[in-house]
Amino acid sequence: MTVTAQQGDATLEQEISAVGKESPLPALASLHDLQYFDSLQTFSYSTSPTANQAFTDFSGVEELSHLERFSMNGARPETLEPLSHLSQLKQLSLTECGTLDLTPLEGLEQLESLTLSSNDRIVSLEPVTKLPALRSLSLSSGTAVPSLEPLAQTNLAVLDLGLGVGQSGLYKEIDYSPLSQLPDLVCLNLTNHTRVTTKFCKQILAHSPDLRFLNIQNTPASEGSALDVEYLRAYTEADLLKRLANKLRNTFG
């Protein structure tokens, strides 16, 4: 179990390693005590989902009006409503958190980065269309979604949909066409998506002029020779990194 909290320039980090089967400290059960850290800017908590199934309530975090970064791994929140009060939140990571309804996140106007990797399911991606500053979204490592259609209404620069080996079935009924409607894309990860073809990749390239990183490892497109990406090779590695840095700087400020 790892807990990290940052307040201003001071960082408190606590790492607990269990020698036997039991941890020296009980698993986190409540966030209410965080109210005493009223200037907290960063909070991160990670534990095994099986060891922390009782942690289902995010209540208390709404008191952290200065919080900019919140990361939680292994919880099973019944609702994300407490997060809706974090008006300064810029980065949010919820991993291995079961099934998530993102509706309470609507209106987080400062949120730039949202990581939802390794969850069971996202009820709907519609709420991400109500996040005007969102530029980076990760749904990697087996997080199931009902549709990618809402993504066409976003201004994403970074999108990670990478799957693990054997997870391609999660997308067997998914319409990929919204991915060709993201003109601001810089980075796209489609690893292990077995329905991604060369033809579709051409559509993405045609409609995403800023795209510089496209991962199609273990897809049908990676086996074809017809995918014309010569314009991507026209830049040196240093130039690519410079362009990406400038793009992300303009995106995230």
Task: Describe each PLM feature range.
Residues M1-G60, H66-P104, Q110-P178, D184-G224, ...:
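Concave beta-strand-loop units of leucine-rich repeat
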